[in-house]
């Protein structure tokens, strides 16, 4: 799987216990290996054991925005912002104060390359009305993780390029995403594009259903490589369906972040112009 370090916004969604954190961890490991910087907003302490970043905050101590920014000034440091010490009602305000600072750092340095927001429906609820300075329309390198995509602020959902769903009834999560955007649209605006109708999808362990909003294609299933701690080999990304290779893409370009192994039949993904493309290495 290849993630372009700029220009993509991803929604990772699924029911509780479906493997969202596992997939996010696998992606973050590859980002760390390729020296792309990230900042994880971690409301529940789910990433405390992640080895590629420094944790700021704990259940008895809230993190400091200044401390987060001081850490991210160092290009080789990733940050996990643990919000267990911040009251539930105060977390959206904390994040609203942190995001502009992250954007200022990006404007100066281009970093962090990715901002990962777990439990996004709590930090960015539907009632959130950000200003243009808090949430600029050109914001990219954003990964939202949530059980309830329809409970996330529409202004944030509108930035999403690609949806990755796991767990039971994954197509329902995509439907909830599209419905949330439709409810928020102004009169006269065109309807949000929806995925082509397909039969209900049953995913096996390790699989995800992926949909690109702008592709005009139906969602497709893909088996994802697990994190290092859950595999006995370097890992690979296996194609689920041999027909899921998009025309016009036959080689994986240099660069990007590989989430598959080097096996000859390995299928790979790459974000390109907001599209998650399936590529097969030859």
Where are these regions (language model features)?
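P-loop NTPase catalytic phosphate-binding loop
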Residues: 1-114, 124-143, 147-151, 156-159, ...
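Short, glycine-/Ser/Thr-/acidic-enriched flexible segments
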Residues: 8, 17, 149, 170, ...
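Conserved P-loop NTPase motor module
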Residues: 11-13, 201-281
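Short intrinsically disordered coil segments
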Residues: 19, 180, 224-228
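Intrinsic-disorder-associated interaction segments
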Residues: 61, 170, 189, 264, ...
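Exposed alpha-helical structural elements
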Residues: 64-67, 134, 172, 176, ...
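Conserved phosphate-binding elements of NTP-dependent enzyme cores
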Residues: 119-121
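Conserved ATP-driven motor cores of ASCE-family P-loop NTPases powering translocation/secretion/packaging/pilus
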Residues: 141, 148-214
């Amino acid at each position: 799987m290849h993630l372009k370090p700029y220009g993509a916004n991803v929604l990772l969604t699924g029911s509780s216990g479906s493997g969202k954190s596992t997939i996010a961890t696998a992606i973050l490991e590859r980002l760390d290996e390729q020296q792309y910087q990230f900042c994880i907003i971690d409301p529940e302490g789910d990433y405390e054991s992640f080895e590629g970043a420094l944790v700021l905050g704990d259940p008895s101590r809230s993190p400091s925005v200044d401390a987060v920014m001081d850490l991210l000034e160092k290009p080789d440091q990733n940050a996990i912002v643990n919000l267990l010490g911040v009251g539930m009602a105060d977390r959206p305000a904390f994040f609203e104060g942190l995001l502009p600072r992250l954007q200022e750092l990006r404007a100066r340095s281009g970093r962090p390359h990715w901002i990962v927001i777990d439990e996004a429906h709590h930090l960015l609820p539907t009632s959130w009305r950000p200003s243009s300075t808090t949430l600029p329309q050109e914001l990219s390198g954003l990964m939202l993780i949530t059980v309830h995509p329809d409970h996330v602020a529409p202004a944030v959902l509108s930035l999403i390029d690609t949806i990755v769903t796991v767990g039971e009834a994954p197509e329902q999560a995509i439907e909830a995403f599209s419905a949330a955007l439709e409810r928020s649209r102004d009169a006269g605006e065109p309807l949000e594009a929806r995925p082509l109708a397909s039969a209900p999808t049953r995913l096996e362990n390790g699989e995800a259903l992926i949909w690109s909003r702008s592709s005009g294609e139906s969602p497709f299933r893909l088996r994802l490589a697990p994190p290092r701690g859950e595999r006995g080999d370097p890992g690979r990304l296996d194609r689920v369906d041999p027909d899921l290779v998009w025309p016009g893409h036959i080689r994986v370009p240099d660069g990007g972040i590989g989430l598959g192994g080097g096996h000859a039949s390995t299928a790979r993904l790459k974000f390109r112009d907001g599209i998650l493309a399936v590529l097969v290495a030859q």
